[in-house]
Amino acid sequence: MADLAKIVEDLSSLTVLEAAELSKLLEEKWGVSAAAPVAVAAAGGAAAAAPVEEEKTEFDVILTEAGANKINVIKEVRAITGLGLKEAKDLVEGAPKAVKEAVSKAEAADLKKKLEDAGAKVDVK
């Protein structure tokens, strides 16, 4: 048992480069590859993420920039969110920030149009 504790202690003191070299040496000695399971898991994760994007029904309206007409943008943010003057001003000046989250595609497009008409730059994600 003392030998295992020493091995653990020795492995813990390795640098990242030394650990990578150790990994390569063990792969060669045992005839295995540590990279194969990781690549398969990454490919599976990417395939699983694709259907989620296709089914997206909720969108976030992000104010990326207030533009030159900040006062009109603040008024529009207040109308959309129901925030007070100070909170709306802080949101506009702190761009990029979410104005509304988890809204339908139609509502997100409507909010984007209103904010852009007020002079803001907006992203829908």
From Swiss-Prot:
It comes from the Bacteria. The keyword Ribonucleoprotein applies. One of its GO terms (cellular component) is cytosolic large ribosomal subunit. One of its GO terms (biological process) is translation. GO terms for molecular function: mRNA binding; structural constituent of ribosome. The keyword Translocase does not apply. Keywords: Ribonucleoprotein, Ribosomal protein. Homodimer. Part of the ribosomal stalk of the 50S ribosomal subunit. Forms a multimeric L10(L12)X complex, where L10 forms an elongated spine to which 2 to 4 L12 dimers bind in a sequential fashion. Binds GTP-bound translation factors. HAMAP family: Ribosomal_bL12. Belongs to the bacterial ribosomal protein bL12 family. PANTHER family: 39S RIBOSOMAL PROTEIN L12, LARGE RIBOSOMAL SUBUNIT PROTEIN BL12M. Forms part of the ribosomal stalk which helps the ribosome interact with GTP-bound translation factors. Is thus essential for accurate translation. NCBIfam families: L12. This is Large ribosomal subunit protein bL12. It comes from Sinorhizobium medicae (strain WSM419). The gene is rplL.
